[in-house]
Design a protein with these regions (language model features):
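Short catalytic/metal-binding and nucleic-acid-binding patches
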Residues: 1-121
Length: 121
């Protein structure tokens, strides 16, 4: 649970799969850079070994493989569907037993003082 991401994305200019691909590319490069250069990650060598190992078996990766290749892009056609998906996403850490209430998960828009800010629907 703590190693996956759920997003609700809307774009008026580009297909969401293109935006998501760019997001994954950019974040992978930045996170790998922080891991490689950082002194705070104690598991640095192990993590880089795992990313290198998985890159060996993927045809479109050079040195590291960070994100899974499969994306589950689900169109949300109605406001009701959007609200259902938000409720589902907020409840994931509760179902995983990481918190007792959705608002306790600090990496969620359900948190009282979220680090992630949602645009109005």
């Amino acid at each position: 649970m703590s190693n996956c991401i759920h997003l609700i994305v809307k774009s008026k200019t580009e297909p969401v799969n293109i935006i998501f691909g760019r997001f994954k590319s950019y974040t992978a490069k930045e996170i790998l850079h922080v891991i490689e250069e950082g002194v705070y990650e104690k598991r640095k060598d192990w993590m880089l070994l795992v990313f290198r190992y998985h890159a060996k078996y993927k045809t479109n990766y050079d040195e590291f493989h960070f994100w899974d290749s499969d994306n589950q892009l689900i169109p949300l056609e109605t406001l009701e569907a959007i609200h259902e998906k938000i409720a589902f996403i907020h409840n994931i850490p509760v179902e995983a037993g990481l918190v007792s209430q959705a608002s306790h998960w600090v990496f969620s828009s359900a948190h009282n003082q979220p680090t992630l800010i949602m645009d109005a629907l």
